[in-house]
Amino acid sequence: MASRKEALVRRANRVRRQIKAVANGRPRLSVHRSSKNIYVQVIDDVAGRTLAAASTLDGSLRSSLKTGADTAAAAAVGKLVAERAVAAGVKEVVFDRGAFIYHGRIKALAEAAREGGLSF
């Protein structure tokens, strides 16, 4: 039986394999969630570069957030990464939720990124 870590890695790889099949050259909006913070970056897999990034540890967000571990913080990060991605010239991405289910903080981040101008 697989350990929790092995199962997490297997789920993340499965999601990434599905994303690469439908990406068509679009950058990937990759999300990582920890118990205290949430991190997101827009990655161009063809060039191997990060085009935009944001997290609850950003100086511009950290002072305005009560905690980095709630849906309000995730929505603020989603809006910030959308602004930075649009400024970098990215409007269409594929959403990489990794091994995390599309619920709660992940869903709040995705909806805020859509409202901020990203389409996926």
Swiss-Prot record:
InterPro entries: Ribosomal_uL18_bac-type (IPR004389), Ribosomal_uL18_bac/euk (IPR005484). GO terms for cellular component: cytosolic large ribosomal subunit. Keywords: Ribonucleoprotein, Ribosomal protein, RNA-binding, rRNA-binding. GO terms for molecular function: 5S rRNA binding; structural constituent of ribosome. One of its GO terms (biological process) is translation. Belongs to the universal ribosomal protein uL18 family. Part of the 50S ribosomal subunit; part of the 5S rRNA/L5/L18/L25 subcomplex. Contacts the 5S and 23S rRNAs. This is one of the proteins that bind and probably mediate the attachment of the 5S RNA into the large ribosomal subunit, where it forms part of the central protuberance. PANTHER family: 39S RIBOSOMAL PROTEIN L18, MITOCHONDRIAL, LARGE RIBOSOMAL SUBUNIT PROTEIN UL18M. This is Large ribosomal subunit protein uL18. It comes from Allorhizobium ampelinum (strain ATCC BAA-846 / DSM 112012 / S4) (Agrobacterium vitis (strain S4)).
